[in-house]
Amino acid sequence: MALHRLKGHGANVGNRVGIQLDKDFVLFQGSEQEALAVYLSGILSLRLKETTTIKYIRLHLRGVRRVSSDTQSSLPARTGRKRFCSENEFYSRTWNFFDGYREAPMTVPAGEYKYPFDVVMEGSLPASVEGMKEASISYLFTVEIGRRHGRDITFDKPLRVIRVPDLEPCSHDFALDEVWANKIAYRIGIQNRTVALGTRIDVDYVFAPLLRDMKIAFIESQLLEVRDLSVEPNDGGSAHAARTETIVCSDRYTLGEEYSSKALESYQFSRTLQLPQALGHCVQDTEDMGVRVSHKLKIHVRMHNPDGHESELRLAIPVLIYLSPYYRVWEDSFCGETIPLPETLNPSDECPPAYGMHELDQLYMPQD
């Protein structure tokens, strides 16, 4: 599950410094109160083409939360927008492999050197939040190598932290089964209210008009993403809250001729909402450090009454979008760039089937 490209400063940094981790990402299972700590280890590799005098070798792991928001001034004398910004470091860990300030600078012959490191990341840490221009929660490894002669070397490698929520409470079928205004009975159901980013939401519809000659014009469904941000400025000013709502994906369905017959007592059909595969188009549900993202499925039903008037039925179903560790999300999508979606996916890129739609696992049978 790749993240943004590696970054560094100094001559031929990519050929000199590297960080190899024992896992591609940190995975927390459950809420911040339930998740167990995760052990992460790795190796910092340094390749020198010539003898070099080293002043220090350090490795940092930092977690940073950034939030920014624009607001329109409500005072007549003050026009224009004001930008609120907040940034704070909530996690920091440093490894000093060599410190020239405490020891004499070290002359290192040409060759390849490896420095192992490890860390235990507590399950209460917030998950990475990417894909939003106005907010982010990110983790970053930074290598600093000071040289007596020549430019110092720095190298960055991001670390993604994923939290998979408890899927059991929302993993069963959910349906709204009601009679609306004594005009129409309906049943709208989804198989699972917990959905992995990049998969789909299947919606089943059943409508039974209670009035003669009442017809359904169209059904529109939208996945709405709601972002609530709390900004505490770095300059100590007053806090600021902001909310934005975005339509992630939508579907509009007009009933065809097969449903126009008056003899039909009910309308039954199914529709699908395909979720984006890029974090720049959809963000997983989260509520950490003043960054809250939630989703709901909004359904709008337009109906023609026998007297010629129109009626509208509006419904909303809360859903939880999570980032699956088994599904590929597009790298660099956190920058808000438009990432073209592929026409086809390789089998290795596909998400595991939704709950209730999987096949029984087959036992391994060795061949004779």
Curated annotation (Swiss-Prot):
* Keywords on record: Ubl conjugation pathway
An example Gene Ontology molecular-function term:
ubiquitin protein ligase binding
Task: Tell me the disulfide pairings in this chain.
Answer: none
Example GO biological process:
regulation of protein ubiquitination
What InterPro entries would the database entry show? Arrestin-like_C (IPR014752), Arrestin-like_N (IPR011021), Arrestin_C-like (IPR011022), Arrestin_domain-protein (IPR050357), Ig_E-set (IPR014756)
SUPFAM superfamilies per record? E set domains (SSF81296)
Q: Spell out the Gene3D superfamilies in the cross-references.
A: 2.60.40.640
Provide GO CC annotations from the record.
cytoplasm; cytosol; plasma membrane
**Keyword Transferase applies:** no
Q: Its function?
A: May be involved in signaling by recognizing appropriately phosphorylated substrates via its arrestin domains and then recruit a HECT-type ubiquitin ligase such as hulA, leading to ubiquitination of the substrate, providing a link between ubiquitination and phosphorylation in protein regulation and stability.
Q: How does the annotation summarize its subunit structure?
A: Interacts with hulA.
Membership in a protein family: Belongs to the arrestin family.
The entry's protein name is: HECT-type ubiquitin ligase-interacting protein apyA
Upper taxonomic lineage: Eukaryota, Fungi, Dikarya, Ascomycota, Pezizomycotina
- Gene designation: apyA
